[in-house]
UniProtKB/Swiss-Prot annotation:
Pfam families reported for this sequence: AA_kinase, PUA
Cellular compartments per GO CC: cytosol
Record-linked Gene3D superfamilies: Acetylglutamate kinase-like (3.40.1160.10), PUA domain (2.30.130.10)
Function: Catalyzes the transfer of a phosphate group to glutamate to form L-glutamate 5-phosphate.
EC category name: transferase
GO molecular function: ATP binding; glutamate 5-kinase activity; RNA binding
Official protein name in the record: Glutamate 5-kinase
Lineage summary: Bacteria, Bacillati, Bacillota, Bacilli, Bacillales
Domain (PUA): residue spans on this chain: 276-350
GO biological process, one term: L-proline biosynthetic process
Native species: Bacillus anthracis
Family, per entry: Belongs to the glutamate 5-kinase family.
UniProt cross-references to InterPro entries, sorted A to Z: AceGlu_kinase-like_sf, Asp/Glu/Uridylate_kinase, G5K_ProB, Glu/AcGlu_kinase, Glu_5kinase, Glu_5kinase/COase_Synthase, Glutamate_5-kinase_CS, PUA
Protein keywords: Amino-acid biosynthesis, ATP-binding, Cytoplasm, Kinase, Nucleotide-binding, Proline biosynthesis, Transferase
Chief place where the protein resides: cytoplasm
Length: 367
């Protein structure tokens, strides 16, 4: 089996004991299976939930708190306890762990996004196992990543993973709720996430988790768009993750055919960047960009909206108002208003620029 880069996401429901806390037995089971992946020569990143579950009892809560401040307080206590438990277990296998706590803003700010990419790459090069969680104790919005399902998809794209394994307490995707319908049909393989499949996933998670199957399906769709195949399911024992790679996992495989990965800068533009303005273009420019993969030139620009600076991301729309994509603009809004509609030779004659693309094709994402 060739060496692969694997992202494994373990949700709260796959870590919890009967009292809603963290089960040492389950955690040990997961660690043993992750160590087997490493033993087989694979690079492994772990996305783990469970900070709230690990910390609420230490603060005297009788059960998992329901308020945002209660969850964040429990996460602040539980994250260190959770990391300590993982570190002690991985040490038995001689594996060095590293902790990364991320929020949405770490993805939306390009410098932080690039730093996360560089740090993860270096950790993997040094054979460490990164353990990643949302920074629940300071996140501004409740349940930002949906029990880390979307976080796992975004990280898998960031590191160009070969596979994302989302482990939960349900053994895959069904056409209806298997707990309520005996005739529920299980999907063993889905080539893609269609609107029909997305609509079948329920909204509610388990009592212990926050994601539910809908967030897992959404995460799978995002991962596929980034060139990463996905497995959603469950399992026990030391071989469970290796079995997934062998096609023997207890769950649903989604899009396991080779996918074209999206470059890091385009991932940031497509999924994380904040749009600072809009550019309207003519039909010829739209055809050149979408059908022929060309860069956007000033000659094709017909209107500029907003007040953006050089390097900020803008949406691009047709004269009929249809948004066709977005990209990083090499002009400020003021500069672009001054040169819109001009041919490159005209701009060159003014002696103001040596870079004539408004948006270079390497910094463009089509919708």
């Amino acid at each position: 089996m060739k060496k692969q880069r694997i992202v494994v996401k373990i949700g709260s429901s796959s870590l919890a004991d009967s009292h809603e806390g963290i089960s040492k037995e389950q955690l040990s089971d997961h660690v043993a299976a992750l160590a087997r992946l490493k033993e087989e020569g694979h690079e492994v990143l772990l996305i783990t939930s469970g900070a709230v579950a690990a910390g609420f009892s230490a603060l005297g809560y009788p059960s998992r708190p329901v308020t945002i401040k209660g969850k964040q307080a429990a996460a602040a206590v539980g994250q260190s306890l959770l990391m300590q438990a993982y570190t002690e277990e991985f040490r038995k296998y001689g594996i060095v762990t590293a902790q990364l706590l991320l929020t949405r803003s770490d993805f939306s700010r390009k410098e932080q996004y690039s730093n996360a990419y560089a740090t993860l790459g270096e950790l993997l090069n040094r054979s460490a196992l990164p353990i990643i969680n949302e920074n629940d104790s300071i996140s501004l919005e409740e349940l930002t990543f949906g029990d880390n399902d979307m976080l796992s998809a975004l990280v898998s794209g960031l590191v160009s993973a070969d596979m994302l394994m989302i482990f939960t307490d349900v053994n895959g995707l069904y056409d209806k709720n298997p707990q309520k319908n005996e005739d529920a049909k299980k999907y063993y393989f889905l080539p893609e996430v269609t609107e029909e499949i997305a609509s079948l996933a329920g909204d509610a998670g388990s009592k212990l988790g926050t994601g539910g199957m809908k967030s897992k399906v959404d995460a799978a769709k995002t991962a596929l768009s980034l060139g990463v195949s996905v497995f959603i399911g469950t399992g026990r024992g030391q071989e469970k993750f290796v079995d997934v790679l062998k096609g023997k996992g207890d769950g649903t495989y989604v899009g396991n055919a080779p996918q074209k990965e999206m470059k890091i800068n385009k991932q940031w533009i497509a999924l994380h960047s904040v749009v600072s303005g809009q550019i309207e273009i003519d039909a010829g420019a739209a055809t050149a960009i979408i059908q022929h993969g060309k860069s956007l030139l000033p000659a094709g620009v017909t209107n500029v909206s907003g007040f953006f600076q050089v390097g900020e991301v803008v949406e691009v729309m047709t004269q009929q108002g249809r948004v066709i994509g977005k990209g990083q603009c090499t002009y400020s809004a003021e500069e672009l208003r001054d040169v819109k509609g001009m041919q490159s030779q005209q701009i060159q004659a003014r002696g103001e620029r040596h870079n004539y693309e408004v948006i270079h094709r390497d910094y463009w994402v089509s919708f």
